[in-house]
C-alpha cells in the first residue's frame, strides 16, 4: 500500500469512529436531560406525596445515574476531540504527499540572510526544506530542528558516529507512524506552537521565589495536621457533648488566618510567575507521557527517554499545583478549604518541595522533548520519501563528495533528471551553461543533499558518499537600501565573509553561482579570476556556476586543480533542456536567441 492510500484509509477510519462517537454523544445528552428531569420530578413529588421517602431514594438514584452519564459523556467528548486532532494531522500528511505543506510552519523567522548557506539552499520560508520536515509542536522543537539544519557537524564537533546514531533514531521513528501521528496530535490544539521560552522563563523565575522561614521548618506539616485533628475533635465534641459551636468555629477561623496569611504572598507570586503557562504545561505533560510510554530501541531515543523518566510525575504535579492555585479564585471554596484543611499552607509546602526535588531539571526536560520533536520531524520526512536512500558518511579528513544518480529533493522522482558528480578535496569545478539549463538547481541539490546526509536523513540519490566538512554558498546576494548597501557591495561583503569563515575551518566546500555579477563583463572576469586564484591557496574546495566561458580557461592553466563541466542545451524550433551535467564547456547560449524569438512573436 502506498502512502497516499494509507492516509486515505486512515482518514476514512477516523471519520467512521468520529461519527459513531458523535451518535453516542446524542444518546448521552438525551439520558442527561431525561434523568435530570426525573430527579426534579421526584423531588417535587416528595413535597406533594405523604410518606414519600421512596421519592428521595429514586431522586438519589437519578442523580447517581445522571452523574455517571456526565462522566461517560465527558470521556466521549475528549475522544472526539482527540480524533479531531488526529484527523488534522493525518490530513496534513496526506496533503504533503501532493506537495501541499501549508499546514506546517515554514520557519521563516529562523532565516538569517548572513548565514553560510540557509538563504541560498531554501532552508526556510514557503515550500522550504524546513517546512517539508517540520512536525514540531513547541517553539523549542522548532528551534532544535532549525539548529540541526543550519549547524553542520563540522561546526560543533559532531562526527560520523553521531550521524549514524541520528540515522538509527530517525529510521526507528519513521517506522512508528501511529506513534508519531499521536504525538503531533497532542500538540495540535492551538493555532500556534507551544511557547517553550515562556515555560522555561516561568520555571526559572519560579526557582527564585523566596519562602517564609516558618514554611521551611520541618515540623510545620506535623503541627498543621495536629491542628486539623484538633478542629475535627472539637467538631465531634460539639455534636456529641454540651460543647458549644463557638470553639470549632473559632479554631477554624484561626486556621484560616494562619494558613491564608502565611501562604498568600508566596502563592500569589507563584501564580503570577507560572500560572499563565498552565495550558503549555498541560501539553508538556501529555507529550512527556507519550514519550516515556513508548518502546524505543535506538541508543539516541533510549537516552532521551531515560532523561525524561521522572518528568511525567514532576510535570503532572506541577500541573496539579497550578490548577490548585487557579482554583483559589473561588473565594468561598478558598475560605472553607483553608478553614477546614489549611490548604494554602500545604500548597506552599508542595511548591517548595517540588522546587527542591526538581530545581534545574525542568529546563533539561524541555530540551529533551525538543530533541524528540526534531527526530519526529525527520522521521516523518523519512516516511514520506521511501524512494530516498541512506548516505554513506566517511571519516576522511578531507572534502569527499561522491554522488551517483542524485537530484534536488524538491523535485518529483518521476520527473527529476539524475546526475553523477564527484568532488575531490582542494579541487574546483567550473560549471558553464545557458540560462534555465539547470546550473542553480544542480548547485542547490549538492548543498541540500549534503545537509540531509549530515543530519542522518535520507538523501535523494542512488548513492551518496560524503565526509564531514564545512559548507558556504553565495547564490542569492541582494542589495539593502535601508543600510545603503548596493548589490555589488553586498557581493563583496559576502565574499569577505566566505574568506573569513573558510579560514576558521579545516575543510570547506564553497558553492558559488555567478559571482561579481554586479559589475561589467571584463571587470567581473578579472575579479573572478583573482578571487579563485586566492581561494585556491586556502583549504577550500569549490563548485562555481558561471556564464563566463573565459573562466573555463583555468583548466588549461591549472589542470591539477580546475575542471570544466557544463549543462548544454539544444536550440531550435523546439528548445531541448537535457539537465544533464557533462565534462567540458557549454557552447550554446540562449539569451539572445530567446529574446530574438520573443521580439519576432510580438510583431
Where are these regions (language model features)?
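Alpha-helical coupling/stalk and coiled-coil linker elements that connect catalytic or binding modules
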Residues: 1-434, 442-471, 493
